[in-house]
Amino acid sequence: MLTIESIETIPLRIPLPFTYKGSYYEMRNRCAIVTRVRTAEGIVGEAYNADEDEPLQSEIRAIIHDELEPLLLGQDASLVERCWQTMLPVTFDQLRPRWYAMQAIACVDTAIWDAFGKAVGQPLWRLWGGYRDRVPMIGIGGYYVPSDGSQKGNEIEDEIDFFRLEHGMVGMKFKIGAKLPQDDVARLVRARRHAGDEFLFVVDANQGYTVSEALVFLGMARAEGIELRWFEEPTRWHGDARSLRDVRMRGNVAVAAGQSEHSRVGMREMMVAGAIDVSNFDASWGGGPTEWRRVAAMASAFDVELGHHEEAHLGSHLLASVPGGTFVEAFSPDRDPIFWNLIVNRPELVDGHFPLPDRPGLGWELDEDYIEAHRADR
């Protein structure tokens, strides 16, 4: 028995040194919510999730404390599926975006799993299946340089050196989609020349292209001798799964998507439509590890590989637990100071792989001083 007594949330917000621009979005802060589920037995489940800035950060925390916590008080945290189903009704409000509630559930579900792992003395990657104890890591970069002079102009090369030389990562997810295809190809060629042929590349348009633009990009990249591990979110939202399928079939390229879905239902539609080769469903946004594992089970029936959108501290456990896992992802320290500074016992890569901890639960020790220094509620 793990009787839930209370839930604590701590919002974190760290301003970034400059604006990071993707296709149609900009990032100025790195944010997270630290969630702690306290039990009567003294075990505390702890996790951080939900990379959302204000006002959504406050909205998610309000859902946790005003709606989820009253439902869970007195419940047994070791009955994880029951806890998840107990939380599900908060998604039924049709006048509120459903993904707000799914992110709130994700925060609590992750912390509940951490508590359960601690109670049974097992790390989550092993508890969830234990397929391997380390996962290859790729970096995320290639953001567009601002025109205000705040950056030097050699950021692509510096990022690659950080990922490849300093940390031994096996590849890079490269941002495209804000420029014309030929301009993005030129940026990718520059990156490939600097990185060398053994460094793999994924491209991520963040829904920036039309189908035609995505196909032009692929043709030009191939003419330069560049092969991609996959093409992530190549097309705009209104094309739905059909556009992804068109790029996949007409472009003869592996397509990844899923981070913009917030439940297994949306992932089911993508898989049934033959739209993706790789799911990058995000457990920290979409209902937590419980929902991610449902997506993973479904993906195995469709021969779809598994990634995880960002959040290496959680994605590594999930991807290590299943046969179809691909790469865990990490930003540079400027883009994600939380990953590089919050986790006290973050391991160094071994031959390009991120080792999983043997400690129970998620196994991470969070830096209390860092949390206190970057609280957004003070």
Model-inferred region functions:
Residues 98, 135-157, 176-178, 205-211, ...:
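Active-site mouth loops of central-metabolism enzymes
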Residues 14-21:
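Short Pro/Gly-enriched beta-strand edge/turn motifs at strand-loop
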Residues 6, 38-119:
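Metal- or metallocofactor-binding catalytic centers and their adjacent structured scaffolds
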Residues 2-5, 12, 26, 32, ...:
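Flexible C-terminal active-site loop/helix
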Residues 4, 42, 68, 108, ...:
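Conserved, mostly hydrophobic/aromatic
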Residues 174-309:
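Catalytic core of soluble alpha/beta enzymes
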